[in-house]
Structure formats: C-alpha cells, structure tokens
Amino acid sequence: MKSLAVAKRYASALFELAREKGAIDSISHDFEVLEKAIQETPDVKKVLDNPVLIPAAKKELLEKLFPDFNPITKSFLKLLVDKRREVYLPEIIALFAEKLREERGEMLVEVESARELKGDLSDLIKEKLSRLTGKKVTMKVRTNPDLIGGIVVRVGNKVYDGSIKNQLYRLKRSIYG
C-alpha cells in the first residue's frame, strides 16, 4: 500500500510539471520507451532494482541508454535514483499513463483472447466499449490459449469473462457443487 502512495505522489507531481511545461506527450513517449525496455530487457530491470549499485552508475546507465529523452524525464529519473525510489518506476509509469488517459477522456481496456483477434472483431469490441463507456477506448490485447475460446475483458476493476474456460468451470461447479 505504501508503494502505491509513493508512486502516486511522484506520478502526480511529474504530471503537473509536464502539463505546466507542455511536455506531457514527450514524457509519455519517453515512459513508453522506458517501459518497453524494462519489460523486454531483463538487465535494465535488474540494474534499476539492484540496491547495491551506486546511484551514479545507475544514472550513467540511464543517460547512455536514453540520451534522447526529454530533459524533464531525465531529471525525474535522476531524482528517483538519488532518492532510491527507482523501484517504484513501473507503478509511476502506469499511474502517469492513467492520468493522461483520464485527462483525455480515454479508457484502457485489456482484452484477453484464446486466439489473435482479427481487425474487424477488434474494431467492433472497441466501438461497443466506447459507446458503453462514453470514452475513447484504448485496447491492450493479448492472447491466452488457456481460455480455449471466447474473451475476457477488463475495464478498470471490472472483469467480464466470456471464455470457454470460465463456462466449463461454472458448469463443473454447478454439477459438483
């Protein structure tokens, strides 16, 4: 719980500064690049999470890996490293993106499907959800063969499970109690 509170304070402060300086889009892009690097390159995450590594080494690495980042993003990352708060970075990135979507009247919807969604179906789901919520929908789609068929949709903290896996589970529970 404490980590979420800390991450919220940093994300809010950065978002307000970014709005003030007109750098929201630039910082958002920087965070997308950084998030991708953390997810796809385990060494980046290991370095950031390593409490033994001195801050100067972490800052030097970040500067070498991301020389084109906005100066505000660079300063923010250096501040996090100096304050030993870099472990909160994934949460800060997610909260910053959430604030940006909120400001733009957008909503992130996570869709999990047994197979890859074809273009028309993906567009149809997005359109329906947009009409239901009254917001522009951004979809994060991933495949999960364990679902067997159907989809699972996560909108905020609600989950709509239309998967065959869930239907079989419910059938099993109704039979065996």
Curated annotation (Swiss-Prot):
Alphabetical GO CC annotations of the entry are:
plasma membrane; proton-transporting ATP synthase complex
Principal localisation = membrane
Q: Say which domain of life the source belongs to.
A: Bacteria
Q: Where in the cell is it found?
A: Cell membrane
What membrane topology does the UniProt entry give? Peripheral membrane protein
What stretch or stretches form a coiled coil here? none
Q: PROSITE patterns given for it?
A: ATPASE_DELTA
**Record-level Gene Ontology MF annotations:** proton-transporting ATP synthase activity, rotational mechanism
Q: Which UniProt keywords apply?
A: ATP synthesis, Cell membrane, CF(1), Hydrogen ion transport, Ion transport, Membrane, Transport
In Pfam terms, one family for this protein is OSCP
According to its UniProt entry, the function of this protein is described as:
F(1)F(0) ATP synthase produces ATP from ADP in the presence of a proton or sodium gradient. F-type ATPases consist of two structural domains, F(1) containing the extramembraneous catalytic core and F(0) containing the membrane proton channel, linked together by a central stalk and a peripheral stalk. During catalysis, ATP synthesis in the catalytic domain of F(1) is coupled via a rotary mechanism of the central stalk subunits to proton translocation. This protein is part of the stalk that links CF(0) to CF(1). It either transmits conformational changes from CF(0) to CF(1) or is implicated in proton conduction.
Q: Which family does it belong to?
A: Belongs to the ATPase delta chain family.
NCBIfam families from the UniProt entry? ATP_synt_delta
Subunit structure of this chain's protein:
F-type ATPases have 2 components, F(1) - the catalytic core - and F(0) - the membrane proton channel. F(1) has five subunits: alpha(3), beta(3), gamma(1), delta(1), epsilon(1). F(0) has three main subunits: a(1), b(2) and c(10-14). The alpha and beta chains form an alternating ring which encloses part of the gamma chain. F(1) is attached to F(0) by a central stalk formed by the gamma and epsilon chains, while a peripheral stalk is formed by the delta and b chains.
Protein name from the UniProt record: ATP synthase subunit delta
Q: Which organism is it from?
A: Carboxydothermus hydrogenoformans (strain ATCC BAA-161 / DSM 6008 / Z-2901)
Task: Give the encoding gene's name.
Answer: atpH
